[in-house]
Swiss-Prot record:
The gene is glyS. Its main location: cytoplasm. Its EC number is 6.1.1.14. Transmembrane segments: none annotated. Tetramer of two alpha and two beta subunits. GO terms for cellular component: cytosol. GO terms for molecular function: arginine-tRNA ligase activity; ATP binding; glycine-tRNA ligase activity. It holds the Pfam family tRNA_synt_2f. This is Glycine--tRNA ligase beta subunit. The keyword Cytoplasm applies. It is an enzyme of class 6 (ligase). One of its GO terms (biological process) is arginyl-tRNA aminoacylation. Belongs to the class-II aminoacyl-tRNA synthetase family. It catalyses: tRNA(Gly) + glycine + ATP = glycyl-tRNA(Gly) + AMP + diphosphate.
Amino acid sequence: MTTQNFLAEIGTEELPPKALKKLATAFAENVEQELNQAGLAFEKVEWFAAPRRLAVKVLGLAEAQPSKQVEKRGPAVSAAFDAEGKPTKAAEGWARGCGITVEQAERLSTDKGEWLVHRAVIEGQLTKNLLVGIIDKALAGLPIPKTMRWGDKTEQFVRPVHTVTLLFGADLIEGEILGVASGRTVRGHRFLGEREFSLDHADQYPQLLKERGSVVADFNERKALILATSREKATALGGVADIEEELLEEVTSLVEYPNVLTAKFEERFLAVPAEALVYTMKGDQKYFPIYDKDGKLLPHFIFVSNINPDDPSKIIEGNEKVVRPRLTDAEFFFKTDLKQKLEDRLPRLETVLFQQQLGTLRDKTARIEALAGEIAAQIGADQTKAKRAGLLSKCDLMTNMVFEFTDTQGVMGMHYARHDGEDEDVAVALNEQYMPRFAGDTLPNSLVACSVALADKIDTLTGIFGIGQSPKGSADPFALRRAALGCLRIIVEKNLPLDLADIVAKATALFGDKLTNKNVVDEVVDFMLGRFRAWYESEGIAVDVIQSVLARRPTKPADFDARVRAVSHFRTLDSAEALAAANKRVSNILAKADIAIGEIDLGVCVESAEKTLAEAVLALKGEVQPLIAQGDYTAVLDKLANLRQPIDAFFDGVMVNVEEQTLRQNRLAILSTLQNLFLQVADISVLQ
């Protein structure tokens, strides 16, 4: 079948930069989905995104839907004709619905009899007649939280739409999208190239847009250009550019034709902690900082302009002029903050509520101080340092710098603590208390910092659950899911010997009579353990493996993790499926047992199969106990996997629920002991 390339470009006003890539990829995915639903064959869908446009290009799109052969079965021949051989009303009605006469119907013979049948070929629709509807639906399905109207139009979109370009090969697809008639016109750069021009063919996009309109429509091309040029510019200055993926994509979304330039600021600003300078450069100005080979900030930065004059000096001067007041503010705040010690800011924490029912930030720091000390004692950290860091943990929130540059909380506490002469472990803990801040973030380095980070997060979890405000649906205003996962990561990855039930109980006690939820400890522990599921699923671990461990509810996260790893390994063994099925059978038998179950008595065994299993179970009971104590659950399950043959032989040749009570009790005891061996690791019966 003949194919053509299809272009759809939606020309808009400036789109939200942080949402641009998501909108573009969703547009392409939706178009692909609509094409598939329409039965239109194509090779691939490419997407393009720039500040004032979203576009897709469908390569190798068929010019029509394929023809379909349909078969509509009618009544049985025996019911289609009367005794005289005339068509019945049922047959005539069916034929009329097919647009034929009964005489034109074909016959279909099956093993159940002969039937009337109508076979026809339905020609597919032309692609050009379907494209407007496909694009309309694809745009309607975009993830746009807030839409807007413009002019006197009733249509709504993320930003006002000015042009719609729909080309199927060289043909213009006429129609209306979002209240705008389609055409061949595309708009160029606001200041460079041609303001607007026409395309003769879909294949001219995006190259002609770059040549005549000075717009690089390919998002990934712009991104790669910015990244490569920024690195070159930084190297020329003897440094390395700090280019985070999120900021790189935001900057890519802000420019149509990137021009990467460098500028500088006064060296005196380097006396201010680098984090504060970087915060304003990245967050406010969308600049890329430059560091030397030792990781020290250089007095230079990289920015990306959307215009490309022959002499860029005025643009460079303008950016230097814009950033100078922000850096001056940071310098002033820093110098002012140094005049007062962190500890002297404690009284001001009494004026700030953490949560109305849970008290002030000063109340919270007192709880963190106490809980950090408890945790430190259990993990081998310095209690005095942990408590000191807990006491000072929120003091930097009262500084000018953090008030103005909120994302510097923690790191400014570290710098101020160093200036105050606090111990280095204490200072570092003030910064690392917030780690991990996001998925994949680094963890606190020292055990002192781990103590404070855990204390802070568990205090928040316990307090909010304690007043009955656990997360509902997607709402999570206190970021409790992130806090819970952060605790699990710290405990598991640092292999800390902490029991959640114990720590949460201690945290609960520190609230005094403020908490109203009597089940707070169990609810917090269950909530935290529940976070394991998302973590392990992201690693590709099967859900039933996680559920098998959750069924046992081990409350030590490091122990929980060891069990999951062991069961995940066990699941790969040849005997795993049979043993899981056997455990299900054992569970069902024991659940129906109506007599007391004692210990195994080898002397009561009658059948060789039951004696063999009993001996194997008793032998393994002794062998696995040291391994259980060591937490070597993989070795435990490897040993238990050897029970497959004696278990199979037992169920093949032994009846458990016999009339003779002593024999029945002993056989139930064998199964109970067997079950308990597995349950010391996980509930294997849950495995699918």
